[in-house]
């Protein structure tokens, strides 16, 4: 019997339930971000049982990566299946968010959240002169909500269509839009389509977190983990 299976069998029934919920969350969202309040308990649970999760996902050709410096877990399909392919408009928003993340990060201490307003996203969109007008409010809402479903950002105040809405940007953006893609940004945006991809389960990725909460165990431990992960 493989070691991770033995470790799983030794778990309490309560922890096995937590394992199921956490594994499903990873499949739905691709990332677990320590800095995101709703992810933190799952991040800690994965960190505590990393070998079990990696062994479990490896059976289906998934690799669970731990970006310790950024405190992010990323689920990656080794065979490059179950991928979501972003269209051009979605790609523009991804690149804008990554640019804003970098700009804000320079001005903040490492312990603080990176927050942007809706109007900052709109201003950056127009400043790049990619298109001569903003997308509709409904289209912006759809894109931002979809990206939130991947734990790339989180709406904190207001509505997705509100220019005064506040969003927290997460370091998982750096996994989706890496430095190489930023360097070739002009060339990429000249395409009709773009090959940035994310892992995708068969479930609807635009589900609100509250729907997921219906199956969550309320008393998942939140004690600090003493492993190697950086927080």
Predicted regions and their residues:
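Short alpha-helical segments that sit at the start of domains
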Residues: 9-10, 78-115
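Eukaryotic partner-binding/assembly regions in large regulatory complexes
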Residues: 1-79
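Accessory beta->alpha helical hairpin/"wing" motif in late/C-terminal subdomains of nucleic-acid enzymes
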Residues: 73-75, 154-177
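Long, low-complexity, intrinsically disordered segments
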Residues: 209-231
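Short acidic, hydrophobic short linear motifs in intrinsically disordered regions
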Residues: 33-41, 108-126
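Short amphipathic alpha-helical interaction segments
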Residues: 45-53, 133-149
């Amino acid at each position: 019997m493989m070691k991770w299976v033995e470790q799983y069998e030794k778990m309490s029934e309560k922890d096995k339930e937590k394992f199921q919920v956490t594994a499903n969350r990873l499949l739905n969202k691709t990332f677990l971000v320590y800095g995101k309040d709703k992810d933190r308990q799952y991040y800690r649970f994965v960190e505590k049982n990393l070998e079990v999760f990696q062994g479990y996902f490896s059976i289906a050709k998934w690799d669970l990566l731990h970006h310790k410096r950024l405190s992010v877990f990323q689920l990656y399909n080794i065979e490059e299946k179950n991928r979501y392919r972003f269209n051009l408009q979605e790609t523009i928003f991804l690149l804008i968010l990554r640019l804003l993340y970098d700009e804000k990060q320079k001005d903040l201490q490492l312990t603080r959240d990176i927050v942007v307003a809706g109007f900052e996203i709109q201003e950056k969109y127009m400043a790049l002169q990619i298109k001569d007008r903003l997308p509709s409010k409904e289209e912006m809402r759809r894109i931002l909500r979809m990206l939130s479903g991947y734990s790339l950002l989180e709406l904190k105040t207001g509505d997705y269509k509100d220019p005064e809405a506040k969003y927290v940007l997460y370091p998982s953006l750096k996994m989706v839009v890496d430095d190489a893609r930023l360097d070739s940004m002009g060339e990429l945006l000249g395409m009709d389509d773009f090959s940035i991809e994310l892992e995708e389960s068969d479930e609807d990725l635009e589900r609100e977190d509250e729907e997921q909460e219906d199956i969550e165990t309320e008393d998942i431990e939140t004690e600090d983990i003493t492993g190697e992960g950086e927080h």
